[in-house]
């Protein structure tokens, strides 16, 4: 998996889902993230903790800005002191390499 972020190649109908044989490797690169499945669709998600709502909202807005840069958007749930980020590729109904790259970007924003 590359650290460079392509435009939303995961949004193409012919984009390939992550090879199941590589899934553990990708997950190991974002160890705080967990694999989920909803209605047969694999996703990765993580809860981030903050001291207050303002900091949670600031993080949400930063993640939203990077999502807008490449037109690939996560599910974001913002609460007092917590943000849950969930990535998957809607078009292919599953995980693409881009989802893991975006999870790494979220980590960079959080740790900045």
Swiss-Prot record:
Keywords: Lyase. Transmembrane segments: none annotated. Coiled coil: none annotated. It catalyses: (4aS,6R)-4a-hydroxy-L-erythro-5,6,7,8-tetrahydrobiopterin = (6R)-L-erythro-6,7-dihydrobiopterin + H2O. CDD domains: PCD_DCoH_subfamily_a (cd00913). GO terms for molecular function: 4-alpha-hydroxytetrahydrobiopterin dehydratase activity. GO terms for biological process: tetrahydrobiopterin biosynthetic process. Its EC number is 4.2.1.96. Pfam families: Pterin_4a. It comes from the Bacteria. InterPro entries: PCD_sf (IPR036428), Pterin-4-alpha-carb_dehyd (IPR050376), Pterin_deHydtase (IPR001533). HAMAP family: Pterin_4_alpha. Belongs to the pterin-4-alpha-carbinolamine dehydratase family. This is Putative pterin-4-alpha-carbinolamine dehydratase.
């Amino acid at each position: 998996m590359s650290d460079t972020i392509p435009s939303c190649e995961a949004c193409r109908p012919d984009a390939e889902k992550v090879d199941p044989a590589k899934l553990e490797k990708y997950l190991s690169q974002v160890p705080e993230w967990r694999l989920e499945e909803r209605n047969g669709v694999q996703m990765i998600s993580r809860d981030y903790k903050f001291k207050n709502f303002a900091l949670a909202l600031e993080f949400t807005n930063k993640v939203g800005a990077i999502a807008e840069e490449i037109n690939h958007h996560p599910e974001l749930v913002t609460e007092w002191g917590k943000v849950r980020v969930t990535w998957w590729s809607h078009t292919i109904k599953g995980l693409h390499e881009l989802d893991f790259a975006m999870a790494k970007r979220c980590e960079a924003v959080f740790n900045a």
